[in-house]
Amino acid sequence: MNWPNMRFIILLLVYAHIFIFANSTFSLSAESSDFTMKGQKGEMKKFFLHSQPVSIDKLPVLQGDNTEFDLMKQGYNVILVNFWATWCRPCVEEMPSLDKLQSLFDPHKIKIITIATGRNNQKTITNFFSKHMIVNLENFRDPKGSLATKLGIFGLPASIIISPDGNEIGRLIGPIDWIEADVVEFFESLLL
């Protein structure tokens, strides 16, 4: 094997190791510092509720016209932010149920925002939403992944729930069926 090919393989292995280590480190810290709610069932077993809310000052994303937009300044009651990518199969599979979940709630009370992380251009996102008939969700972009990195998102899909006072109250890493009864009940409980 020649040196350029060997160098590429070594570099690929180093990046894979870093990616795996970063995800496992984050998962361990999430499990040790967070707790699940007593009696969680079904898909909500995957949700980690923070023991202390985590303050978030800004959520800067790009709109379709490439202008910056701060999600924290919109005055929603509860925000579910879903980080995803068009190339991420689990993201693609969960998106229709996420769209259905938004249809069940007044968007001024519970707002579901999707943020395409990484190299997802607006045309590709728009085509994806059209092809999969996603009509209830707003889409934004985090093209450099800087917001995802700032929030400790190292795998996709990932979702965080933000309270009206701007604090992250919990997160979920991985796909779920967003219209399972336990999930819907959880979001209904946030409105009480």
Region roles according to the model:
Residues 1-60:
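N-terminal targeting signals for export/organelle localization
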Residues 58-79:
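A short beta-strand-turn-helix
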Residues 75-78, 108-111, 136-137:
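Loop/turn elements at helix/coil->beta-strand transitions in domains of secreted/extracellular proteins
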Residues 77-79, 83-87, 155:
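Short pre-active-site segment immediately N-terminal to redox-active cysteine/selenocysteine motifs
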Residues 80-81, 112, 159:
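Hydrophobic beta-strand anchors of alpha/beta hydrolase catalytic cores
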Residues 86-93, 158:
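C-type cytochrome heme c attachment motif
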Residues 93-132, 143-149:
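Structural microenvironment flanking redox-active thiols in thiol-disulfide oxidoreductases
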Residues 127-135, 141-189:
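Thiol/disulfide oxidoreductase modules built on the thioredoxin-like
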